[in-house]
Structures are given as C-alpha cells and as structure tokens.
C-alpha cells in the first residue's frame, strides 16, 4: 500500500480522434452536479435481484454458456431400469433440441424487443449505437488487454537529470544515450539552444562507451551519478533489488579525463554496497555496506569506518522496511551538509520489532543454495515488520564531523520519547544548522527543531497539534526548501519554505528567520499545493509550485514572489490540464510535462524572465496519437456528487458508441486510500479503459471521503474508522447509478487492489447484496491490526487508543457478504506488504459460517504487485474472465447446484421461459 494519492461541471469528452497532440483541443461538456439525501436511499431498499442475463459483449467469445449446453455429454443422459434404444434416445434428444431452439428464439425476440441484453450484437444494434452515441464516433478496434499489460498505451516520457554547473551555471542537464552508441553519458547546456546572444557551453562527454573495463572485467552500469564538479562519475553494476526503493550493487569511481574506473573500496572490490553519495565538494563518497557507514576520500584508496556496530537489527544511513515504505519513500536516510563538512544520518534500531516470515515456495530470492537435506523446504525471509500496536523501530539522528572523524548526537529539549518518535525530514541550512521535522507515533503532533552542529545544541522552533486543529494527521513530506539569506535581494536572514495547514487546505509558508514560528503565507484559498515547492529562483525571489487551483482533478504550474505577491499561472488554465514540472538547479529552465487529458507532450522552457521566450518540444508522442485515431476508446465523463455535504469527484467511462436506450452493466473501480486520488485528468488507457472499450461495460470511479486534494474536511473525515464512510459513499453513488435509465441494476460489480481490495470487501459487507452483486478484491487488508504500524496508526490511532475503531474496520460480517451473488479473492503468496495472513484469516471466518459464494486464487512467490512468473498477465485475464462470467449470469448457475436427472430438467434450466 504505502504512499503510493472542485469541479462544478461534468465534462463529456471521448478519448478518440478528437484529441489533439498539443493538449489544447476543446471538448464538448455538459453540467452535472449530483446530490443525494442518503436517508432517503436507506429507506428505499432494493428487492432481491433475479438471475443475471447474458452479458453485453463485443465479441462472440464472451457469449453465455447457454449456447454450449445443447451438446450434453452422454454421462449426463437420464437413466432408468429399462435401457433406452438408440432411436428412442435420438428422438428424445431431437425433440429436446427443437424445444430448446424454439424457446431460445422466442426468448431472444422478447429480449430484443424490450432492449434486453443479447449475448452478441446485430448490425442494426451497432448502427443504433453509432447514431445515438454521445461521445466516440470511431469505428476503430477496441482496446485489447495485451496492449494494456504490455504498456502499448503508455506515453513516452523523458526524465531529465538537471545538474548544477561547477561554476554556478544554470541549465545543465545529464543525458544517457543508447548502450551501443558513443557519448553514452554527456552533459548538455540547454542555453546553447536559445540563441547566439546567450552565454553557454558546448556539450561534454562524461562516459564515452557504456561498457567499462576494470581490471580485465567488463562492467555494464545500471546507474550513474556524476560528481558535482563533473570530473568523476559514480557507477553501479550488478544491481539487485531489495524493497520498493532500495537495492544493492557493486560501486565504482569513474575518472572522466582518463575514462578509467576503480572500485569504490579497493580493499573490497566485490562488496555489495547499499548506498553511496557524493560530497558537495566532489572529494569524497559516503557509503553504506552491511548496514555500516564508510567514507572514501578520493585523495586516498583507504576507507574510513564511520560506524562499526551495524548489523541485522541496527541500520546506519539506510532505512529499515517500514521507514522506506511509509516515511522516507527512498533508500537513503543520509544527508551531506552544503559545505561537505558534516554528514547527518539516521540510526535505526529494530531489535524490538517483531519478525514476519515471508515464504517462497518456487524461487529462492536470496540466491543461496539450501543446506543439504533442505532442498524441498521453502525459503523463508524474516522481515522486521511492526504491525499496528507493536514496537516501532527506534530512530535517532546522528552527525559525522568529516574533519575530526567523529560521530556525535545532539540532544534537543521537548523531543518525542524514543518509542513515540518518527523523523520525517532532515534539511541542512547554512553554517552547520539543520532543520528536523518529527511527529509522534500517531502522526498528529508535529515538532520542528533547529540544530546547530557547531555548538552541538538544538531547540524546538515550531509545534503543531493537528489532532486539536482538525482531528486529522500529517503526511510525511520531503519538499521543504532552504532559503539562504541575501540582504541585497531583501532577505536579511536564512529561512525555509514548508507546507502548512491554512484554513483547511495545504498551502506554502515562508519561515524566516529559521527559528520564527510565524510564517509569511505564500498561498491561500480553497485549493491545495502538491509536493511543493517545486523550485525557488533565489536571484529573483520567485517560488514555483504545482497546485489544484482550477480543480482537484487538475494540476497546473504557478509562481509567486517570496512576499506572497503576484501569483501567476505558467500553464494554460483555460482548459483542463494535468501538468508536472522539473526545474534546473537555478530554476531558470524547466522540463514541462503535459500529462493529459489529451495525448501527453513534453517541452523544455526558460523561466528566468517575466515571459517564456524559449520552448523546445522534446516529445509529442506521435505513435500514441496515431493509436488514439485508430482505436475506439471510452468516453470519460467527469462530474461530482455531493453526499452528506461532501463534494466528491467522479469519472464515468462509457463504452464507445454508447446507446442511452440500452442497459449496461456497471463496474465500480476504486482505491480510496487516505490522501490518494484516482479521479484526475491524466491521459490513461488502463484496465478500466479495456473493460469499457472491449467488454462494453460502464466503469465508474469515485474518490470518496478520505481521498486527497479536496481539502482536509474531505480527507480527515475517515480518521479512526477506515472503511465506513468510504463504503457509504460508494454504495450511495452506486444506488444513484442504478436508477439511471441506461444502467442494468442487476449487474453491478466493484473491484480494487490493496486498499481498494479492502474497500471492495467493506462495500460488499456494508451493502449486503442490495446494490452490488459482485466484487473482486486483490491483496486486501481485512484487519488493520495486521498492517504496518506507521501507515495504520496515522489514520486509525493505535489499537490501544482506538479498539472499537479497529473492530469496526475489520471485515467481520461475513453473513452480509454471503448475500452478494459472488466475489473473488486474489493474493500473492509472498506479499511482504499486505501479508497473506489478511486473506487467510478472512477465509477462516467464511469457513466458520459456511459461506461459499466466492472464488479464490493465490499466486506463488508473488509480492504485492503480483508479477512472479506469468502472474502479471494471468491475474488481469482472471479478473476479466471472472467479470464476464459474472455479468453473463454464470455465477447464478453454480449456486445451490442439483444433479440433473433428465433431459427435460436440463432444457428447463437452459431456457428460463420454460422454467415457470
């Protein structure tokens, strides 16, 4: 799960040829603000649903099983004491087939006249869809599952690595060429493309060829990091993945001038290194091996041991599993000071953290051969995994004085106790000062400390009691920017820009001096900044950021002065847009990425003046634009619903050639984890698009209460009671959709993965078969006491403080789930994130009450992403086929089975018209 995220009018636009590659095409729209009185819906319960009819499909391979039931195998023919002759048996079968065909013809005629769903479409029906279509007019092919799973619909995107020039130049970027080309790694100066009057440098090759020879060995670097002075490059080969962000490898120092390399630690050339970072002065590398920290000064081949007691339970400079997954979302907890004189790093002690065994039945991820006699036993990896309420790792901040070769802590007053401290950010200022942000275990109290490493003292400079402010929490973030003093530009003191809560929304605040708790607000309003600030132009005193100012579903780029004045948009806000941006070191240039709703594109722009005078498009995605012209894509309808006073964002995906006179099955797809977002304006062709385009079903996604970017009122409503309000919102919206004239209320399903899997089960539990007949839950949490402490307690408090909340959030009412027609459970057997314990204990509850209306599939050795062997392709095929069978009514046929004792019984079951 991990940390994986106001529109008044609904907009109707087809994802078809009417999209433009520039992202500026207009779209037809219609207003649609929906509200509902939930008390009314609670008093108007639906009756039990009849057996499902055959599903809406565009291809005959998804036809109902009725077509195959005429060919009955001989073992299922009736038996009696008198043996039937072949003629008698043939005549019986013949007349049964005649009756079956006549009944099927009559039934098909009735269903056709009443606009019922046929198992395949006729030409006149297809024409009728085209004529009544409100969106797509393309006669192209439907999206295929193979295309989605192989990334054929993924936009091509360039990730530019901006780098500061050795002499303060702005606009330098690092690029890597194809492996078989010369000039494998080079630094280019984007200023050289602006014009003759711009002072710039020519490109410089850092690594000529990808293959590097060291002591007779050929290396193929997986990752490369140039030194700040661009004279050396840190290479990593022999990559091995650890957790989500972390990995290990062999590291090398490459000399640009001689095009030669040497081991990072010449005494241990084959040692696997967990982390390596250049010093700002380019004369040293700090690295971690076997959980201990080391320093390699380039002036010597010897290595200095910074720590010596690191080991299985003690980490230096790198996070343990839970910090990597839920707090830092990175592989490093090591920070060089700006002058290269100090290194700050975390010491993580997880000796008190209980272990969870992850078993591997097919593979051996460790790469080790088992001892003789144990070849037939699974490999077990013991993970230090703190579940809710269990001991957390104890984390302390330490400092290393490079010149004195000394490690020291700094005690600060008013710090959190060891068992109630989460350090979420460390930021170096100037003159050896450090800003440290920490929270309590439940993430609802924030303390900001200012530490002076020279005097080895510290003090508390800010305290925020989030629990008393709005009852919510604070998310870990790592975007705080240090603003150095510059009296000539009106900044007499050092400061920093942080994201704070202001009138119920996340906004930017400028704190100066460093110990001033009262900021200058840079942004305000009923919208939020996102992962901000993006960059700061210190010369001009301008802050750049991305925000939801136009709509929670959009992202635009803005700038504002450090005094909070002159807020301006850099992107075109007159049209829906979802932008991302990365700035050069001095914020004079940027890579602007348009990610939707039209075909994505990328351009490099200059931002150093009042106007953008330079723009170079580096990606237009022509292949993707051509595919959009060729394929019949769903129509996306963005709107909002208002439930219990909360305005929530929603997108409905309609099949191509949508016909409002027909009735369509509906699939609700959700994630709905706290602060997450699934309803946005990005260009996305995914599994949901495949369902709408290829299977012909409507897909609805609602960001219910608890989701992000709509303000803290919406976000914090779920605290302490995960699943309750989110499920209520999904069910309420589904009841609204069930009343729409084009929706088949007898064929409604819901599905999700991870938190979405939890929500699928919670919805089915709360709904008890009234609205949703089907559900598909992948890797679900079923009891929050089984999930990791940092994530869970942020939103639920500890089990000790909130026992009733944990009980309410657990999937316990399996009797309610038994009222659904059927549901599907899927889990990776080696999931290190959401443990298979969740699904197995839930299945035990089903067993105890003899609940049998479910299917289950486990994927051996797959983690939370379910990729091992053929799992990635198979799981989506499984989901697709299961859903087709559900909407074709086949799961009705396996409920309460009875043996067939005559051909006539088979006929009656095959032709519902004869069953009455």
Swiss-Prot record:
MF-aspect GO terms: aminopeptidase activity; dipeptidyl-peptidase activity; serine-type peptidase activity
For this UniProt entry, which residues form the secretion signal? none
Which spans are transmembrane here?
93-113
Q: Where found, per UniProt?
A: Vacuole membrane
On whether Chloroplast is a keyword of this UniProt record, the answer is no
Q: Which UniProt keywords apply?
A: Aminopeptidase, Glycoprotein, Hydrolase, Membrane, Protease, Serine protease, Signal-anchor, Transmembrane, Transmembrane helix, Vacuole
Query: ATP-binding as a keyword?
Result: no
**What does it catalyze?**
Release of an N-terminal dipeptide, Xaa-Yaa-|-Zaa-, from a polypeptide, preferentially when Yaa is Pro, provided Zaa is neither Pro nor hydroxyproline
Cellular component (GO) terms are: fungal-type vacuole membrane; plasma membrane
Membrane topology, as annotated, equals:
Single-pass type II membrane protein
**What does UniProt list as catalytic?**
754, 831, 864
The record's annotation in SUPFAM superfamilies points to:
alpha/beta-Hydrolases, DPP6 N-terminal domain-like
Please state which protein family the record places this protein in: Belongs to the peptidase S9B family.
Q: What does this protein do?
A: Type IV dipeptidyl-peptidase which removes N-terminal dipeptides sequentially from polypeptides having unsubstituted N-termini provided that the penultimate residue is proline.
**Which protein, by its recorded name, is this?**
Probable dipeptidyl-aminopeptidase B
- Organism per entry: Aspergillus flavus (strain ATCC 200026 / FGSC A1120 / IAM 13836 / NRRL 3357 / JCM 12722 / SRRC 167)
Lineage, opening ranks: Eukaryota, Fungi, Dikarya, Ascomycota, Pezizomycotina
């Amino acid at each position: 799960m991990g940390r994986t995220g106001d529109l008044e009018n609904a907009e109707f636009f087809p994802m078809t040829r009417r999209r433009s590659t520039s992202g500026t095409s207009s779209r037809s729209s219609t207003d649609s603000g929906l509200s509902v009185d939930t008390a009314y819906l609670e008093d108007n319960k639906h009756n039990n649903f009849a057996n499902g009819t055959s599903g809406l499909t565009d291809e005959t391979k998804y036809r109902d099983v009725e077509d195959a039931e005429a060919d009955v195998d001989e073992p299922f023919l009736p038996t009696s004491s008198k043996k039937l002759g072949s003629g008698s048996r043939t005549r019986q079968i013949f007349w049964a087939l005649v009756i079956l065909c006549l009944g099927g013809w009559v039934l098909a005629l009735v269903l056709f006249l009443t606009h019922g769903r046929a198992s395949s479409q006729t030409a006149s029906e297809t024409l009728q869809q085209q004529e009544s279509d409100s969106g797509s007019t393309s006669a192209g092919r439907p999206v295929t599952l193979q295309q989605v799973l192989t990334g054929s619909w993924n936009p091509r995107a360039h990730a530019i690595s901006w780098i500061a020039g050795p002499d303060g130049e702005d606009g330098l970027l690092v690029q890597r060429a194809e492996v078989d080309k010369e000039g494998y790694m080079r630094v280019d100066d984007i200023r050289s493309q602006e014009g003759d009057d711009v002072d710039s440098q020519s490109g410089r090759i850092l690594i000529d060829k990808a293959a590097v020879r060291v002591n007779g060995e050929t290396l193929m670097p997986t990752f490369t990091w140039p030194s700040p002075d661009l004279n050396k490059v840190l290479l990593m080969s022999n990559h091995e993945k650890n957790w989500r962000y972390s990995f290990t490898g062999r590291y090398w120092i490459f000399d640009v001038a001689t095009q030669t390399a040497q081991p990072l630690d010449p005494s241990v050339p084959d040692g696997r290194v967990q982390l390596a970072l250049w010093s700002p002065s380019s004369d040293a590398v700090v690295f971690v091996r076997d959980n201990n920290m080391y320093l390699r000064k380039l002036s010597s081949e010897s290595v200095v041991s910074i720590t010596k007691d690191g080991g299985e339970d003690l980490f230096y400079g790198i996070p343990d599993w839970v910090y990597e997954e839920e707090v830092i979302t990175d592989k490093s907890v090591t920070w060089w000071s700006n002058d290269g004189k100090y290194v700050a790093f975390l010491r993580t002690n997880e000796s008190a953290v209980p272990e969870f065994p992850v078993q591997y039945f097919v593979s051996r991820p460790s790469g080790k051969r088992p001892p003789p006699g144990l070849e037939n036993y699974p490999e077990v990896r013991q993970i230090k995994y703190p579940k809710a309420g269990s001991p957390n790792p104890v984390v302390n901040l330490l400092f290393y004085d490079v010149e004195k070769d000394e490690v020291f802590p700094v005690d600060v007053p008013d710090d959190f106790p060891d068992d109630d401290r989460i350090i979420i950010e460390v930021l170096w200022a100037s003159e050896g000062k450090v800003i440290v942000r920490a929270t309590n275990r439940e993430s609802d109290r924030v303390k900001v400390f200012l530490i002076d490493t020279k005097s080895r003292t510290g003090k508390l400079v800010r305290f925020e009691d989030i629990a008393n402010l709005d009852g919510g929490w604070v998310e870990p973030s790592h975007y705080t920017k240090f603003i150095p003093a510059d009296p000539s530009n009106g900044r007499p003191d050092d400061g920093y820009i942080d994201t704070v809560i202001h009138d119920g929304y996340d906004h930017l605040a400028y704190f100066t001096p460093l110990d001033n708790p009262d900021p200058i607000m840079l942004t305000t309003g009923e919208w939020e900044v996102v992962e901000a600030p993006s960059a700061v132009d210190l010369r001009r005193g301008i802050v750049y950021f991305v925000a939801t100012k136009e709509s929670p579903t959009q992202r635009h780029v803005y700038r504002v002065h450090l005094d909070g004045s002159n807020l301006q948009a850099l992107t075109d806000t007159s049209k829906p847009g979802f932008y991302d941006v990365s700035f050069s070191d001095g914020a004079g240039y940027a890579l602007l990425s348009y990610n939707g709703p039209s075909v994505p594109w990328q351009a490099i722009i200059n931002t150093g003046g009042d106007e953008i005078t330079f723009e170079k498009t580096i990606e237009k995605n022509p292949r993707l634009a051509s595919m959009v012209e060729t394929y019949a894509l769903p129509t996306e309808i963005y709107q909002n619903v208002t439930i219990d006073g909360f305005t929530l964002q929603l997108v409905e995906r309609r099949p191509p050639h949508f016909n409002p006179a027909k009735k369509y099955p509906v699939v609700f797809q959700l994630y709905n984890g706290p602060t997450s977002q699934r309803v946005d304006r990005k260009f996305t062709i995914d599994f949901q698009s495949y369902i709408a385009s290829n299977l012909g079903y409507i897909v609805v996604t609602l960001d219910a209460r608890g989701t992000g970017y709509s303000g803290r009122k919406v976000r914090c409503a779920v605290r302490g009671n995960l699943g309750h309000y989110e499920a209520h919102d999904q069910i309420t919206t589904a009841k609204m959709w069930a009343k729409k004239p084009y929706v088949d209320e007898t064929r409604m399903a819901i599905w999700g993965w991870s938190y979405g899997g939890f929500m699928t089960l919670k919805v089915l539990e709360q709904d008890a078969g009234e609205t949703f007949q089907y559900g598909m839950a992948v890797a679900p949490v079923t009891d929050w006491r089984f999930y990791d402490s940092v994530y869970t307690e942020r939103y639920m408090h500890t089990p000790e403080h909130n026992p009733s909340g944990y009980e309410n959030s657990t999937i316990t009412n399996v009797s309610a789930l038994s009222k659904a027609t059927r549901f599907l459970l899927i889990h990776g057997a080696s999931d290190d994130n959401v443990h298979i314990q969740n699904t197995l204990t839930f299945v035990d509850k089903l067993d105890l009450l003899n609940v049998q209306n479910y299917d289950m599939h486990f994927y051996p050795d797959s983690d939370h992403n379910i990729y091992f062997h053929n799992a990635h392709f198979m799981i989506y095929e499984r989901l697709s086929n299961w859903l087709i069978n559900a909407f074709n009514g086949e799961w009705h046929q396996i409920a309460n089975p009875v043996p067939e004792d005559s051909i006539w019984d088979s006929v009656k079951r095959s032709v519902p018209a004869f069953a009455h």
